[in-house]
Amino acid sequence: MSKLTRSYSSKINSILKKILKEEEKKFLQCAKLISKSYKKGGQLYIFGTGHSRLLGEESFHRAGGFAAACPIRDDDLSFKKGARKATALERTPNIAKKALAKYKITSKDILMIVSNSGVNHAPVEAALIAKKKKIKTISLTSVKYSKQA
C-alpha cells in the first residue's frame, strides 16, 4: 500500500470513528424506528434532491439490502434535465409535494429525508408534509454545514 493510500485510509477511518462515536445513539434510534415500522407493514421511503437522492436509489432493489426501502423518484429532482434546472427546482415551492404525491406514504411508514444542508425548500417542505400527515421522519444531513448555510 502506498503512503498516499495509507494516509487517505487513515483519515477516512478516523472520520468514520468520530461519526460513530458521536452519532451511535441516533443510529440505534433510527434502526429501532425503521424496524418497528417494518414489523407493522410500513416502508422506508427515502427523499432527496440532486446528489442526495442517490442514497435512495442506491438502497433500492439491492441483493441483501432492506427490501422495504423505496426511493422517492422524480425526474425534476434529478440531474436528468440538467444540474441548473434541478438546483432551481429544489428551491421551488410545492416541488416536494408533487414528488411525494406519487407515493402512498402513511403514518405507519418512515420518510428519510437526505440533504447535505437541510435548508433548501424541497427537504424542508417534505418534512413539513410528513409532520402534517403524522409520518415519522429521519433526517440525514450535515448539521455543521446546515448551520453555515
Regions found by a protein language model. Name each.
Residues 1-21:
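Generic N-terminal amphipathic, Lys/Arg-enriched alpha-helix
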Residues 4, 19-22, 26, 51, ...:
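Catalytic cores of large soluble enzymes that bind and process phosphate-bearing ligands
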Residues 22-38:
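A short, well-structured juxtamembrane/interface segment
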Residues 42-149:
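Glycine-rich phosphate-binding loops that contact phosphosugars or nucleotide phosphates
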